[in-house]
C-alpha cells in the first residue's frame, strides 16, 4: 500500500489526513468519547511541541548569521508578505469564502516555514542547504511566539466570523500546550537530543500519529456541531483558487526580489523555497489551541490544501532549478505555481 501511495500525485501524509477526516465524519467522537478525544489531543499537542523543542537547534539558527540579508528576506516573506497578501485577499473578496475559511487562510499566512521540506527541496534544486537549514530553523523558533501574536492581531482587525483575536483562555493554552513543552524540549536537548535524532524514524511516526489525533478530534467536534453544511464543492474550488494565487504570488515575488537584490542562484533557491513554505505540523496543533473547538475543522482546511499545493509546486520548481543549474534563468522568466 505504501509503495502504491508513493506513486500517487498526492502526498502520503495528506492521504492519511483525508482518511482521518473520513473516519471523523463517519465515526465522530461524541458523548463520553468527546472529552477523551479532546484530552488526548491536548496531550498530543504538548508532546509535539516538546519534540520540536528537542529537535530545533538554536546553534543551527545562529550559525547562519553571516547570511543576514538572506534570512531577513525569508523572514519578511514568511511573516510579512504572506500576511499582507492574505489580508488583501480577504479585504477585496470578503464573500468569496466563509468567515471560518478566511480565518484559516489568515492563520496559514502567519505560520512559520517548514524545516524538512524546505531543506529537501533546496538540496534537490542545488541551493544553499546550510542557509536553508538555518533560515527554516530560525523561522520555527520565532514562529512559536510570533504566529499566535500575529493571528490574534490580524483576526481581531477583520472580524473573521467572530474570530476576534486571542482570548485570555487561549493565551493560557498557548503557554501550557505550546511554549512550556517547547521550552522544556530546548532545555533537555543537550541530554536527549542525540537519542531523539537517532530514533528520528520512530519518533516521526509519533509526530504524525499525534497530528492525526488532533485532526480527528477537531473534525469530530465540527461534525457534532454541524458546521460542515457551509462547505460545498464550489466553496472548495474557490478555496483552491485562493491558495494557488497566494502560492503563485509568493513564489514569483521571492524569485524576482532575490534576483533584483543580486543574490546568487544558490541563495535565490534557498529564499524561494524557505520563504514560500508553511508548516502543516505546526499549524494543525496551533489551530486547535487558538480557535474554538467546533470551528477548527473548517479553519485547518486551507492549510491542508495549501500543504499539498506547495509540495506539488515546489517539486516541479526544484526539478526546473536542478535542470538549469549551469545557466541562470532571465529575470523576466515566470515561476511555475503548480506541478
PLM features: residue spans?
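The feature identifies polytopic integral membrane transport proteins across all domains of life
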Residues: 68-75, 96-110, 127-137, 236-240, ...
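C-terminal transmembrane helix pair
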Residues: 280-339
Amino acid at each position: 500500500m505504501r509503495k502504491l501511495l508513493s506513486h500517487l500525485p498526492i502526498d502520503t501524509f495528506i492521504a492519511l489526513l483525508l482518511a482521518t477526516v473520513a473516519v471523523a465524519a463517519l465515526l465522530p467522537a461524541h458523548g463520553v468519547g468527546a472529552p477523551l478525544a479532546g484530552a488526548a489531543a491536548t496531550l498530543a499537542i504538548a508532546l509535539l511541541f516538546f519534540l520540536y523543542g528537542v529537535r530545533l537547534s538554536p546553534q543551527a539558527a545562529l550559525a547562519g548569521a553571516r547570511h543576514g540579508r538572506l534570512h531577513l528576506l525569508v523572514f519578511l516573506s514568511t511573516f510579512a508578505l504572506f500576511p499582507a497578501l492574505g489580508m488583501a485577499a480577504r479585504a477585496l473578496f470578503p464573500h468569496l469564502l466563509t468567515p471560518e475559511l478566511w480565518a484559516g487562510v489568515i492563520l496559514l499566512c502567519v505560520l512559520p516555514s517548514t524545516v524538512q521540506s524546505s531543506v529537501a527541496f533546496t538540496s534537490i534544486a542545488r541551493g544553499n542547504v546550510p542557509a536553508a537549514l538555518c533560515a527554516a530553523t530560525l523561522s520555527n523558533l520565532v514562529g512559536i511566539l510570533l504566529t499566535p501574536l500575529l493571528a490574534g492581531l490580524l483576526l481581531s482587525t477583520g472580524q473573521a466570523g467572530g474570530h476576534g483575536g486571542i482570548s485570555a483562555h487561549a493565551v493560557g493554552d498557548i503557554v501550557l500546550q505550546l511554549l512550556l513543552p517547547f521550552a522544556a524540549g530546548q532545555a533537555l536537548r543537550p541530554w536527549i537530543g542525540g537519542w531523539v535524532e537517532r530514533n528520528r524514524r520512530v519518533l516521526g511516526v509519533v509526530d504524525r500519529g499525534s497530528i492525526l489525533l488532533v485532526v480527528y478530534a477537531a473534525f469530530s467536534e465540527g461534525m457534532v456541531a454541524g458546521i460542515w453544511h457551509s462547505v460545498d464543492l464550489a466553496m472548495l474550488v474557490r478555496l483552491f483558487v485562493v491558495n494557488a494565487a497566494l502560492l503563485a504570488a509568493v513564489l514569483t515575488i521571492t524569485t524576482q526580489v532575490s534576483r533584483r537584490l543580486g543574490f546568487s542562484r544558490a541563495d535565490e533557491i534557498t529564499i524561494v523555497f524557505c520563504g514560500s513554505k508553511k508548516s502543516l505540523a505546526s499549524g494543525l496543533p496551533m489551530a486547535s489551541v487558538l480557535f474554538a473547538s467546533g470551528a477548527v475543522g473548517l479553519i485547518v482546511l486551507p492549510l491542508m490544501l495549501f500543504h499539498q499545493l506547495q509540495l506539488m509546486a515546489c517539486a516541479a520548481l526544484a526539478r526546473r532549478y536542478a535542470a538549469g543549474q549551469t545557466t541562470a534563468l532571465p529575470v523576466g522568466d515566470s515561476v511555475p505555481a503548480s506541478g
